[in-house]
Amino acid sequence: MRLSDYYVPTLKETSADISVISHKYSIRAGLIKQIASGIYTWLPLGLKVLKNIENIVREEMNKSGSLEILMPLIQPASLWKESGRYDDYGSEMLRITDRNQREMLFGPTHEEVITDILRTTPVSHKDLPLILYQIQWKFRDELRPRYGIMRCREFLMKDAYSFDKDFSGAISSYNLMFKTYIKIFQKLGLTPIAVKADSGPIGGNLSHEFHVLANSGESTLYYDQDIIELMNSESIDVEKIKNTYTAADDMHDPQACPISSDKVKISKGIEIGHIFHLGDKYSKPMNANFCDSNNNKLLQMGCYGIGVSRLVAAIIEVFHDNKGIIWPETVAPFKFSLVNLYTSNDKCKKVAENLHMQLYDDVLYDDTDDSPGIKLARTDLLGMPWQVIIGKSTVEQDLIEVRNRLTKDKVLISTEQFLNKLKK
């Protein structure tokens, strides 16, 4: 893709009131554009990142045996009144009335809708366990939206809901999602910290939050340093992770902490996921049952959320330097930045055009007439994993310069050798 044909409205600076790195870089790199407080348009580059994250989430959810659906954003208020949660979200829930004066709402979450689906269709014990999920936009009218897409009012979320026959089955589904979440975050290049959490307005009696360590995080985490190795391991041991001490600030009691103070690490964290064992919190008031040997029994439920759009901010918070974003390859909008420093030089142009043709879908090709300094600063800001630099002196030696954005390693290599490496 040629930069001259693409829409990337980059900025040199942002307003002084923007303090968080991910907010600053997502605006400067032209990923998003604010249209109202806490509400953003996703521009081409940002949308590519968002879709890449979405695809990783979808891939791992599908591998777990979960089935994708899509539920409506607008929900009837009657379902929330039936579950007893209508007033729990207070002013965060945006309520509306349709032309027939029926009370509706913009869904901040979908427990009521999914429970209604299961209770109005015959469910046998043979259909269980069942996990349904969606990737859908949500709206919560935050009192103080801040930090850009990290805490906004409209956001993209993956929410899943499990249905089981009994407590044992529900915990198995909970553990399956626990493991699946770790796999998702590992694929994104993140090391999550799972901490026991309060269930809040979602409800239930067992809950874990997943945080990524970042100085801009709103939560303070206390954890056994061994948790890092466990969360990075390819062989994920859910029970061992659960039994390793971790706690957010509202759950940490220094007097009751089971490990010595010298083993307790303290860091800031950004919440990127939350899972809940719900039991019959929704199935009981909404009368959602399954049939077992001609007897109706209440479905045992769980729910599981990942902030897909928030992950964009979290990744930037973890992967950046003072020049810009450093995208992991799994989520990068393009794998390569191709920079022709001298577009008026025939040899530079010929080499660059050839590479653009070879790398077409994986490259953002800066073919503009901007100065070399502006081009190099822009490619650092945009943060593609690999930078391919075409300059006069290197081209005269039939070489190109390839830089790794993360490690800063550089190598001079012929175009032929470079393309051959990509084929391997």
Curated annotation (Swiss-Prot):
InterPro entries: aa-tRNA-synt_IIb, aa-tRNA-synth_II, aa-tRNA-synth_II/BPL/LPL, Anticodon-bd, Anticodon-bd_dom_sf, Pro-tRNA-ligase_IIa, Pro-tRNA-synth_IIa_bac-type, Pro-tRNA_synthetase
Gene name of the record: proS
Catalytic activity annotation: tRNA(Pro) + L-proline + ATP = L-prolyl-tRNA(Pro) + AMP + diphosphate
Assembly: Homodimer.
Function: Catalyzes the attachment of proline to tRNA(Pro) in a two-step reaction: proline is first activated by ATP to form Pro-AMP and then transferred to the acceptor end of tRNA(Pro).
SUPFAM superfamilies linked to this entry: Class II aaRS ABD-related, Class II aaRS and biotin synthetases
Taxonomic superkingdom: Bacteria
Protein name per the record: Proline--tRNA ligase
